[in-house]
A protein has these predicted regions:
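Acidic, polar-rich N-terminal leader regions of halophilic archaeal proteins
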Residues: 1-77
Length: 77
């Protein structure tokens, strides 16, 4: 999964969001077209998000790049 951020259709760094990032993540996913990919950068692994993604038809792959940095590649199926 180690690609540059430029390789994705959209990137959202949730670490820069004050408060709960769920709404911003859902907004970013709404903008994705079929086959497009969002790179979500977070300070923790967002395990509760995975069920929501699957329910909405998205696939995901997670890579921990530092102790407090996770890259979640989310693709619209």
């Amino acid at each position: 999964m180690a690609q540059s951020a430029d390789a994705y259709d959209a990137t959202l760094d949730a670490r820069e969001i004050d408060g709960e990032p769920f709404g911003a993540i859902m907004d970013a996913l709404t903008d994705l077209q079929s086959g497009e990919t969002l790179l979500l950068i977070n300070s923790f692994e967002p395990e509760p998000l995975y069920d929501v993604l699957e329910e909405r038809g998205f696939t995901h792959e997670t890579e921990q790049v530092d102790p407090e940095e996770f890259h979640i590649e989310i693709q619209h199926a």
